[in-house]
Regions:
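Metal-dependent phosphohydrolase cores
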Residues: 1-199
Length: 199
């Protein structure tokens, strides 16, 4: 495939740029478009970055901001439909994104923290009309996460699909700026555990 900026990405080579991720992730709608709200992957990644703990850790915020970035090349396939091969391709693209940004793979602790924040975000999205109706009833022992729901509602109050879809819109620019800011922070943090794999 060719990205927004013209980068060639295949199963074997290439990685989308920060601009590609910012623009394209705001055009990919979560939950296969089943929600009452057209809620993009890019907005989801911003939400996850707000929910990851500890939130003063720039490495965790960075990996949260990038946790679905590979989907701009492989699409957002709902988990029950994703094959083992599709997951392997997504993982390979994700690894190339990290390499292109000069960052290591996240530590196991960071992966777990991002996974938890991702789950909290998904449940909040399911509660606020971003997924298909009845999402919360498909989740075992579902309990509303008021903190995550409140954070999501703050975004929803300001969100418009037009400002997400346009490359020069507010949300692609906000996402790009946030990634670049956090990248600068982690480049100054040479002793963090997630830095151990970096050259």
């Amino acid at each position: 495939m060719l990205t927004y900026t013209g980068i060639h990405v295949t199963k074997e080579f290439g990685a989308p740029s920060i601009v590609d991720i910012a623009v394209q992730s705001m055009r990919l709608i979560r939950f296969s478009g089943a929600g009452e709200v057209n809620w993009p992957i890019g907005m989801h990644m911003l939400l996850v970055a707000d929910l990851v703990v500890p939130n003063d850790d720039p490495w965790r915020r960075l990996y949260a901001l990038l946790h679905d970035a590979a989907e701009v090349a492989v699409a957002d396939v709902p988990r029950p439909m994703k094959t083992t091969e599709a997951r392997a391709v997504e993982d390979a693209v994700e690894a190339r994104i990290y390499a292109s940004l000069g960052i290591p793979e996240p530590s196991d602790d960071t992966r777990q923290a991002v996974k938890l924040a991702d789950f909290r975000a998904a449940l909040a999205e399911g509660s606020c009309g971003c997924s298909g109706r009845g999402f919360e009833y498909t989740q075992t022992h579902y309990l509303p996460d008021n903190g995550a729901i409140s954070t999501l509602r703050e975004y929803l109050a300001r969100f418009t699909i037009d400002e997400a879809f346009r490359p020069e819109g507010h949300w692609p620019k906000a996402y790009e700026a946030r990634v670049r800011t956090v990248l600068r922070e982690v480049q100054q943090d040479r002793y963090h555990p997630d830095r151990a794999g970096a050259a």
